[in-house]
Amino acid sequence: MSKDKNPRRVADNEAMAKLRMLKTSPQKLNLVAGLIRGQKVEKALTDLTFSKKRIAVDVKKCLQSAIANAENNHGLDVDELIVAEAWVGKNLVMKRGRPRARGRFGKILKPFSELTITVRQVEETS
């Protein structure tokens, strides 16, 4: 009568990886995630390698993890993978402050975000 302990959250031809607590704002992370959406994984890795954005290094690690999950856990062919989804969410926002003139206090927000990348195997048509 018990439920399946680990139900599959993606389709049979998909694999995914998540990164949480990334020290950047969701807006900045979404700029980099938008670069790789819908692309083949080889091109996405190349784009992330040569991107000048600081967070591109972490996005590349997450994409490599999704590729490794697809190959090792789900038996998918790496050469036929595309980035099906790359979505960004908000995480916590640390609130800090800085003393300002005349006894005031400036609020400093330090946002965190999370990233989920799903790769899908697509049969190449020729």
Swiss-Prot record:
One of its GO terms (molecular function) is structural constituent of ribosome. This protein binds specifically to 23S rRNA; its binding is stimulated by other ribosomal proteins, e.g. L4, L17, and L20. It is important during the early stages of 50S assembly. It makes multiple contacts with different domains of the 23S rRNA in the assembled 50S subunit and ribosome. InterPro entries: Ribosomal_uL22, Ribosomal_uL22_bac/chlpt-type, Ribosomal_uL22_bac/org-type, Ribosomal_uL22_sf. Keywords: Ribonucleoprotein, Ribosomal protein, RNA-binding, rRNA-binding. GO terms for biological process: translation. The keyword Ion transport does not apply. The keyword rRNA-binding applies. This is Large ribosomal subunit protein uL22. It comes from the Bacteria. Part of the 50S ribosomal subunit. It comes from Jannaschia sp. (strain CCS1). The gene is rplV. It holds the Pfam family Ribosomal_L22. Belongs to the universal ribosomal protein uL22 family. GO terms for cellular component: cytosolic large ribosomal subunit.
